[in-house]
């Protein structure tokens, strides 16, 4: 019969599929010797004649494959549909991959095999390179093989035939693993779809698929026991998409380590001797000229001894009270725990040309555009008492200095920490003067209760927590004696403590800068006064105190009790602790005149002390030159008390609007132990941030009230010009005010042309409103008063 190469290949495949290894070799030998029959006859093997399944398989393989209408091969008779699908996918995928196109049918690999992982995936599905069952995949992927030979292509292990008693077809036992040979270079190529195929030139490169079941280690060696040749390391892609080899990455890492060590060796290690908490002036970090430190006194062995010696030299220089050139504030050392704003303020020194210029700091606020003057007591602690007085004079002269329009240059001046030597105001009066009557408001109500300062101190102590207390504020009390409806008393010991400060000694109502000449401090009508505020806070309705005064309910309230929805019922109440914009002034009516103000702040502590001073007030001050514009924009009623001069609160939106209109302002936060000075014509508003006890008073500066000196100069000039002696007459100038009515007499010499009283105050009337004058003779006057009896009369 006729025999072709294709028939021989199919016979080999059939024998290899169903027979064991030994029987497959024998069948191949018989086929080579001519023992095979034609394509339309059955081949019966002697050893396998009893197995019907084997006969069916051999008959199906020996049958001539006829293509269908579409040009595809018909499925084999004895092959299951699953095997046919695998053969079709393998054939179509291989042909497409040969043409450079990926196969349309996806491989049968499980989804986890598409992602490269280092775990053992288990048995792999058949691929193009190494099929699990050696079948017709190899002839489809490779060109026609050479003439058949007896030597097999490679050591292959075929599944044994099923037992004679079994009737099922293709029931294979688990595959056995054979020893793998050496892996040649270029054995497998990486495809973009993670498929592997054998090389075209080497028929032995097609390794059976059971080699793929071996575990792989990280170093590329197989765990089968036989070491393989390591494949070249793949290039890894970095973040930028560039590929770099692993050895290059290791080299770069080593170079970086070497550079880092080299830099550490070059820099050297420097020990930190001081912590942040001790980096102060007293820690030995001050700068002293090198001429003072002699080389013989220094210990070159220890750096700590050097710093200790420097500290001792600083202390000696401080005791000697040397000049500011020899002992100055260090430039590089600042006090600890300073905020960024405070640090920037301390860096800006005001160049006054004096030796105290390093202690005066000027702040130009970028938002508001106004100027603020600052001084810090921790820097002034180096000064002697005499130098402190000289510095106070210079600082206050700058504070109240004015331009040609009689407007102050600075909106506010602050001496931070200047009141630290004073005791807590509330504790002082509660323990030393417990029966002093005070007027106390009820929190959130308009009722006023009169109690003692000791009882008020107890309520504050009971409700104080974290900077605020939930008791009513204490209204102002006078410290220089109560007049009419005022509350307070005269406390000379406390006033003496205030005068210990050089800043307060000059700016008290009877101070050296004041125009008043009082015989006793109790005659002052400008203060000081003291009051206590709890701080702005939100208070739940359950914590709101009830009013002690019962009032009759109206019919409207009784009707509202029928239905109160929870949405409309307030659950908490905002307690506003604010003083709206106002201008400090003295006098009423035509005697109204703006004046300066001084204040001292003491936070209510009750045992909660901290290194950093607590913020107590949030202040907004407008520039004195914009006084008229601010009065018009805010609609101020200057003749009202300070509490009711303005009806609206100036917030950030209003400030921004006024700033766009050219009005300058300064926003400052005042802290515990601060002393502040406000020049005249400066409109300001206060908001209490935390519980604070405040002192305040007005000061009538000599530069604001030059009336008495002008009157005396005019009197001397008139006495020199007048040559006639006539009976002396008394001119009584009566000034009427709302609070009091005082009379003042000026003794002058009568002349035929007596000058009117308005000429005596010609210079003062240019900037102040005219008071009401009454001229009477001395004979008709029933009462006589001297100028020294009432020196505090505003004129």
Curated annotation (Swiss-Prot):
GO terms for cellular component: nucleus. Residues 122-150 have a biased composition (Pro residues). The modification Phosphoserine is found at residue 80. Keywords: Chromatin regulator, Dioxygenase, Iron, Isopeptide bond, Metal-binding, Nucleus, Oxidoreductase, Phosphoprotein, Transcription, Transcription regulation, Ubl conjugation. Fe cation binds at residues 582, 584, 684. Residues 210-221, 232-248 have a biased composition (Basic and acidic residues). A motif (Nuclear localization signal) lies at residues 252-263. One of its GO terms (molecular function) is metal ion binding. Histone demethylase that specifically demethylates dimethylated 'Lys-20' of histone H4 (H4K20me2), thereby modulating chromosome architecture. This is Lysine-specific demethylase 9.
């Amino acid at each position: 019969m006729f025999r072709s190469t294709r028939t021989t290949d199919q016979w080999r495949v059939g024998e290899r599929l169903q027979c064991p290894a030994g029987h497959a070799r024998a069948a191949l030998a018989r086929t080579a010797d001519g023992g095979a029959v034609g394509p339309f006859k059955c081949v019966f093997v002697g050893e396998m004649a009893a197995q019907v399944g084997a006969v069916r398989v051999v008959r199906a393989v020996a049958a001539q494959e006829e293509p269908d209408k579409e040009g595809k091969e018909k499925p084999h008779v004895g092959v299951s549909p699953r095997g046919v699908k695998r053969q079709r996918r393998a054939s179509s995928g291989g042909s497409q991959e040969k043409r450079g196109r990926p196969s349309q049918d996806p491989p049968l690999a499980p989804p986890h095999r598409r992602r490269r992982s280092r775990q053992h995936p288990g048995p792999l599905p058949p691929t193009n390179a190494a099929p699990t069952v050696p079948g017709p995949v190899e002839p489809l992927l490779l060109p026609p093989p050479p003439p058949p030979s007896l030597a097999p292509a490679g050591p292959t292990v075929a599944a044994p035939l099923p037992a004679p008693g079994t009737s099922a077809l293709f029931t294979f036992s688990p595959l056995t693993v054979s020893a793998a040979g050496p892996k040649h270079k270029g054995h497998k190529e990486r495809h973009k779809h993670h498929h592997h195929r054998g090389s075209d030139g080497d028929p032995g490169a097609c390794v059976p698929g059971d080699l793929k079941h071996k575990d792989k280690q990280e170093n590329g060696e197989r765990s089968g026991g036989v070491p393989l040749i390591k494949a070249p390391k793949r290039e890894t892609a970095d973040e930028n998409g560039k590929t770099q080899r692993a050895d290059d990455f290791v080299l770069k890492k080593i170079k970086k380590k070497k550079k880092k060590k080299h830099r550490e060796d070059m820099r050297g290690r420097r020990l930190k001797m001081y912590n942040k908490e001790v980096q102060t002036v007293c820690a030995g970090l001050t700068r002293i000229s090198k001429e003072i430190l002699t080389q013989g006194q220094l210990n070159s062995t220890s750096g700590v001894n050097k710093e200790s010696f420097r500290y001792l030299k600083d202390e000696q220089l401080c005791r000697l009270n040397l000049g500011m050139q020899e002992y100055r504030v260090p430039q590089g050392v600042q006090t600890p725990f300073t905020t960024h704003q405070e640090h920037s303020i301390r860096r800006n020194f005001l160049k006054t040309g004096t030796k105290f210029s390093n202690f005066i700091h000027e702040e130009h606020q970028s938002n508001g555009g106004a100027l603020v003057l600052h001084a810090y007591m921790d820097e002034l602690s180096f000064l002697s008492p005499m130098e402190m007085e000289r510095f106070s004079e210079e600082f206050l002269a700058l504070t109240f200095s004015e331009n040609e329009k009689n407007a102050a240059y600075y909106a506010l001046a602050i001496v931070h920490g200047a009141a630290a030597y004073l005791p807590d105001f509330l504790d002082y009066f509660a323990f030393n003067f417990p029966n002093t009557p005070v007027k106390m408001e009820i929190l959130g109500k308009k009722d006023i209760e009169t109690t003692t300062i000791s009882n008020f101190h107890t309520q504050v102590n009971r409700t104080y927590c974290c900077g605020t207390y939930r008791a009513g504020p204490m209204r102002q009390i006078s410290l220089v004696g109560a007049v009419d409806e005022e509350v307070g008393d005269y406390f000379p010991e406390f006033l003496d403590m205030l005068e210990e400060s050089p800043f307060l000694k000059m700016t008290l109502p009877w101070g050296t800068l004041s125009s008043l000449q009082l015989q006793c401090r109790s005659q002052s009508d400008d203060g000081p006064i003291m009051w206590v505020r709890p701080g702005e806070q939100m208070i739940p309705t359950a914590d709101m105190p009830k009013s002690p005064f019962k009032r009759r309910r109206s019919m409207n309230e009784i009707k509202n009790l029928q239905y109160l929805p929870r949405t409309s019922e307030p659950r908490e109440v905002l307690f506003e602790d604010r003083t709206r914009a106002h201008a400090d002034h003295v006098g009423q009516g035509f005697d109204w005149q703006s004046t300066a103000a001084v204040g001292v702040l003491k936070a209510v502590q009750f045992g909660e002390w901290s290194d950093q001073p607590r913020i107590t007030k949030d202040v907004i001050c407008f520039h004195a030159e914009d006084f008229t514009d601010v009065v018009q924009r805010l609609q101020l009623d200057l003749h009202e008390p300070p509490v009711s001069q303005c009806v609206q609160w100036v917030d950030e939106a209003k400030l921004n609007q006024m700033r766009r209109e050219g009005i300058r302002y300064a926003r400052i936060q005042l802290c515990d132990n601060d002393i502040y000075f406000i020049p005249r014509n400066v409109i300001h508003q206060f908001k209490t941030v935390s519980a604070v006890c405040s002192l305040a008073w007005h000061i009538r500066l000599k530069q604001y009230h030059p009336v008495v000196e002008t009157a005396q100069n005019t009197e001397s000039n008139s006495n020199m010009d007048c040559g006639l002696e006539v009976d002396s007459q008394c001119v009584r100038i009566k000034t009427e005010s709302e609070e009091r009515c005082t009379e003042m007499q000026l003794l002058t010499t009568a002349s035929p042309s007596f000058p009117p009283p308005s000429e005596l105050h010609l210079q003062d009337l240019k900037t102040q409103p005219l008071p009401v004058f009454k001229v009477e003779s001395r004979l008709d006057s029933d009462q006589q008063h001297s100028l020294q009896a009432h020196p505090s009369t505003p004129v």
